[in-house]
């Protein structure tokens, strides 16, 4: 039972305050949680379908990376009306068990590359006021694929060279446009 914990911060605080949920080796942090974000994707033909993205709780979706990954489709956040059409999804307590093409909801579930086989997570239990601890990727839940749309932090591994990313301020001194692309 984790009542009144619909946000990552509140979940981490409760997890560290309660003796029955505390870790012996260190405190829980947002990176230990699996955040499941629901979107509505509009396809090129105008049809809409839900999409769920699971990523570590210390990350947010980078909208530019999301747009590039889904292009030419367009995404928007789930709204209250969308939750009304999917009563099995409890806002703030959504877990991967309710997601995926094979699930009852049938909602496509893509995960961040950091959610790899064998990693353990705290995530929603699909019941208001409840979360599941030590849910293991590929053992307790599976995704329908991988999507790399999380914001990038200084020190993250570089996907191209294997080194580490170093973020710095820059200035754009030119811009080349490619015909046929939306800008």
For each predicted feature, which ranges?
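Extended, low-hydrophobicity, polar/charged segments
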Residues: 1-183
């Amino acid at each position: 039972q984790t009542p009144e914990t619909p946000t990552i911060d509140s979940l981490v605080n409760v997890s560290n305050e309660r003796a029955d949920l505390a870790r012996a080796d260190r405190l829980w942090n947002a990176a230990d949680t699996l955040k499941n974000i629901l979107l509505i994707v509009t396809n090129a033909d105008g049809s809409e379908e839900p999409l769920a993205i699971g990523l570590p709780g210390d990350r947010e979706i980078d909208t530019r990376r999301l747009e590039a990954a889904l292009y030419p489709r367009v995404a928007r956040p789930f709204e209250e009306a969308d939750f009304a059409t999917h009563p099995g999804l409890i806002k703030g307590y959504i877990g991967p068990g309710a997601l995926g093409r094979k699930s009852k909801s049938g909602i496509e579930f893509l995960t961040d590359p950091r959610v790899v086989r064998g990693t353990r997570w705290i995530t929603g239990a699909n019941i208001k006021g409840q979360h599941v601890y030590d849910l293991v990727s590929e053992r307790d839940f599976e995704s329908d694929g991988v999507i790399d749309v999380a914001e990038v932090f200084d020190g993250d591994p570089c996907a191209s060279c294997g080194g580490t990313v170093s973020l710095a301020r820059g200035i754009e001194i030119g811009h080349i446009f490619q015909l046929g692309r939306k800008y």
